[in-house]
């Protein structure tokens, strides 16, 4: 899988693609179904399959620390997108300039001229461009004008519940890890780097490890029984998580 950081770096690496746009936070079962369908369309059109992400995520840019907790880091998201067979991931920097970009300019400059999109899969509630004036109908009209197909990415449900990153965050907030796993299609995982702490564990006779999660807000809190693998050996431990990181 090829990673392109910044829309300005798309050429000459990419010219023509089957594209979807979104946060893909968690790469859950709904995302996986969208990607499978996009793979089929890309193969039929003999085009690379591309995903456009935003960093930071738009809500993080506008809401800061009040934004919903991420389910996974960008690094982990890229791992799962590669597993799903994505050919190219474009990570667009979401900053003031991008936030103020008129919707029509985003379509013409980026989707048409830079990416030469031939097929676009997007949610019918997708909003984009300055003041969120761009929408699904606008993309459909642009598709007719510039020669690319626009398709509504379907909403997927499990037991009549819409699969979404929000639903997974709600399950985690209720400590319902099994339901979160059902929606994700995989166990919920947290990755981080062990860092130096205050070494308080040495004073109470218990070894401890501080793991930095590199996120503003954690989607889980509480104390969990965990299993740690070290040098091919497993050890049962307790893990404590707070909402703030």
Task: Show the residue positions of the predicted features.
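Single conserved hydrophobic/aromatic residue that forms the stacking wall/gate
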Residues: 237-245
């Amino acid at each position: 899988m090829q990673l392109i950081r910044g829309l300005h770096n798309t050429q000459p690496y990419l010219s023509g693609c089957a594209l979807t746009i979104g946060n893909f936070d968690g790469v859950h079962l709904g995302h996986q179904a969208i990607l499978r369908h996009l793979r089929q369309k890309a193969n039929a059109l003999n085009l690379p399959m591309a995903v456009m992400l935003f960093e930071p995520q738009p809500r993080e840019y506008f809401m800061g620390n009040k934004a919903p907790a991420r389910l996974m880091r960008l690094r982990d998201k890229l791992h799962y997108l590669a597993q799903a067979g994505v050919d190219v991931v474009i990570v667009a920097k979401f900053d003031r300039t991008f936030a103020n970009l008129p919707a029509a300019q985003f379509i013409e400059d980026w989707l048409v001229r830079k990416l030469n999109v031939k097929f676009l899969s997007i949610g019918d509630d997708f909003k984009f461009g300055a003041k969120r004036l761009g929408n699904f109908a606008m993309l459909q009209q642009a598709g007719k004008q510039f020669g690319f197909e626009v398709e509504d990415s379907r909403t997927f449900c499990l037991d009549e519940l819409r699969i979404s990153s929000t639903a997974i965050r709600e399950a985690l907030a209720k400590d319902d890890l099994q339901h979160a796993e059902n929606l994700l299609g995989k166990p919920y995982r947290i990755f981080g780097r062990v860092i130096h702490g205050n070494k308080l564990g040495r004073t109470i006779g218990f070894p401890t490890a501080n793991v930095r999660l590199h996120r503003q807000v954690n989607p889980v809190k509480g104390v969990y029984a965990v299993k740690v693998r070290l040098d091919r050996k497993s050890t049962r431990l307790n893990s404590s998580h707070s909402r703030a990181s």
